[in-house]
């Protein structure tokens, strides 16, 4: 088990929206993640939108992994079953370790909301160069489910018995 802090420690977060249709003005899921992270006390240090292309996704995420400024990457979109949904294929080669439990718990929670449609979600998470990366579906409702029930509690250094803080770059 990890050591747990008695005070809130903000993390440095980058947000990536994967979409061929969304622009900054109508990026509702990206805006939700940004606003929620900031309201929780975290620092959103960058935000970007890339097309549904595994190499564009990988390039942007790789830059953040290499940066000392980013500890956590939140990705919305690109996790479904269509040909354009390539986030898992872009990310899995980058992971030093996959966090299998994220996808499992996300689909369990989603099942309560959308039933068997959750089978089409390929939400993934992993750690690369001490950067924690979460990829979730593009709907704002799915982002809310992931943020409120999984990500936010695990980014809080006060969460017991363990949280992700000991695994992040300083």
Swiss-Prot record:
GO terms for biological process: Mo-molybdopterin cofactor biosynthetic process; protein hexamerization. Pathway: Cofactor biosynthesis; molybdopterin biosynthesis. InterPro entries: MoaB, MoaB/Mog-like_dom_sf, MoaB/Mog_dom, MoaB_proteobac, MoCF_biosynth_CS. SMART domains: MoCF_biosynth. Keywords: GTP-binding, Molybdenum cofactor biosynthesis, Nucleotide-binding. GO terms for molecular function: GTP binding; identical protein binding. May be involved in the biosynthesis of molybdopterin. Can bind GTP and has low GTPase activity. Can bind MPT, but has no MPT adenylyl transferase activity. Homohexamer. Dimer of trimers. This is Molybdenum cofactor biosynthesis protein B.
